[in-house]
Amino acid sequence: MGVKGLNQLIKEHSPHAYKEFELKNLFGRKVAIDASMCLYQFLIAVRQSDGQQLTNDEGETTSHLSGIFYRTIRMVENNIKPVYVFDGKPPVLKGGELEKRLLKREEAQKQIDNLKDDASVSDMTKYQKRLVRVSRDQNDEAKKLLELMGIPYVNAPCEAEAQCAELARGGKVFAAASEDMDTLCYEPPQLLRHLTFAEARKMPIDQITYKEAIQGLDMTKEQFIDLCILLGCDYCETIKGVGPVTAYKLIKEHGSLDNIVKYLQENPDKTKYKVPENWPYNEARQLFMKPEVLPALEVELKWKEPDLDGLIEYMVKNKGFSEDRIRSGAEKLKKGLKAGIQGRLDGFFTVVPKYSNTSPLGKDDKKRKTNDKKGAAAKKTKRR
């Protein structure tokens, strides 16, 4: 579900935390991708002209495999090394959100059943997209394809976005890639959005720098997590009527969710906001503060040469894809992976910022400048 309104708040208070660029600007980077979110996007977006998902002759859905295969190749061709991270067992607190999603799918099915025979393709597609969920079989199929492509994947013990953030924090990858803004609650140095969107959509990639985001909001890590819970996350409902502006104001005024809850409960006559009964906000906070993840140091990532014979057997003979296209894709993949990361200059050197004539100098800089002048004067005296 993500965090409602967080994008808006960061853009307003921390515009410097945002960057937009093209895929090629990630040249030489390793990126951890939220696979479950990625597959969900492919099942929705990769469709035939009549709005139906891609299927093979046996009627099996193949949209997710097409998406993984071609988008991964596109990244590798741009000298990006992706690693896909799959969800593990969801936290107990997420049960309520999962139940809501199930109810929405059931409602969408009712709408489809009630559509008349002459219903438009767009109406049918709209409700069909609401039925989409990533099955266990589809996850397994994607893993098999990645293995044959030589692309590493990680099975997270719990939430995929938390594991992506852990890999980024641990230096295994440059950034976490997910559409879910709650990924920022797990402190990835960088969050990438729209990375796996279709090229035809011409959507730039968003990069959000975590440290700059919370600095602009003038919040601690704990306050940022409290803000996200107040805005609404997957783990618990929010306080009815509290939107982004009010949530930000409450955190700034009271300092923490604990103080906000206490104030609202002790002053029911002074506010229209009611705290939900038995609201598990503290449990939600702990899931963000101490997520269940594999330590980055224990995760080994290896990119290998694709198994062409295996790809032909699986994608062509089993899944009905065009052999010419799979061979062509495999060749591009092989070429891209063989080239490897040719290197970014900032990967080999520590970039030292230059001081401009207009930039203020700190105390240490002023001392250094004074000492440099003294040293230069001494050299002139010696030369004389």
Swiss-Prot record:
Basic and acidic residues bias locations: 362-375
Positions bound to Mg(2+) 1: D34, D87, E159, E161
Q: Where is this region: Disordered?
A: 354-384
- Cofactor (UniProt): Mg(2+)
- Name the residues that bind DNA: R47, R71, E159, G232, D234
Q: Which cysteines are joined by disulfide bonds?
A: none
Q: Where is this region: Interaction with PCNA?
A: 341-349
What is known about its processing and modification?
A: Phosphorylated. Phosphorylation upon DNA damage induces relocalization to the nuclear plasma.
Subcellular location(s) per record = Nucleus, Nucleolus; Nucleus, Nucleoplasm; Mitochondrion
**I-domain as annotated region, ranges:** 123-254
Pfam families, per the entry = XPG_I, XPG_N
Question: Would you tell me the Gene Ontology cellular component terms?
Answer: mitochondrion; nucleolus; nucleoplasm
Q: Where is this region: N-domain?
A: 1-105
How this chain assembles, per its entry, is: Interacts with PCNA. Three molecules of FEN1 bind to one PCNA trimer with each molecule binding to one PCNA monomer. PCNA stimulates the nuclease activity without altering cleavage specificity.
- Report the protein name in the record: Flap endonuclease 1
Source organism per entry reads Lodderomyces elongisporus (strain ATCC 11503 / CBS 2605 / JCM 1781 / NBRC 1676 / NRRL YB-4239) (Yeast)
